[in-house]
Amino acid sequence: MNALTLSQAVSSPEVRVVDADQPRHNDRSLVQVAVGVLIQNDGAFLLTSRPVGKVYEGYWEFPGGKLEAGETVEQALRRELQEEIGITIGNCTLWKTERIDYPHALVQLNFCKVTQWSGELEMHEGQQFAWQHLPVTVTPVLPGTVPVLQWLAQERDFQGSTHS
């Protein structure tokens, strides 16, 4: 399988600003994050809660994590999903990217669709998990997750709110 590159993704040009009233540091560098959109045969997708002690603790998101120096998105996603939720992924496709300006970090989320994996889900960081369909029933949803729910809704011709 070829390494996924950031240029393969469909990107949105704007940066979504979250909690705009909160202060930000001017010297923040862009943090690259690999995110897995795991989709079962019935169309359900996996959301996990952010662990205790992390920013936005308890918010629901797609699993993943930061790229380490020299890693591709695919390598980082494979490592993160093994470390965080105990699975080994098969093929993954870089699908979309989104830049989010949070008060604590400026991030580029690199979303990969994953339809093949092995192993049982084990939440190694104390988080919860839920297989969801649209509209999602878990709350609250992390702001960086909302665009993905909207993209899934477009692909599935889903009408209505994607989340509470």
Describe each model-derived feature in a short phrase:
Residues 113-115, 121-156:
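NUDIX/MutT-family hydrolases
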Residues 14-45, 66, 97:
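Conserved N-terminal beta-strand and adjoining loop/helix that marks the start
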Residues 44-83:
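Conserved Nudix-box catalytic region and its N-terminal flanking loop in Nudix hydrolases
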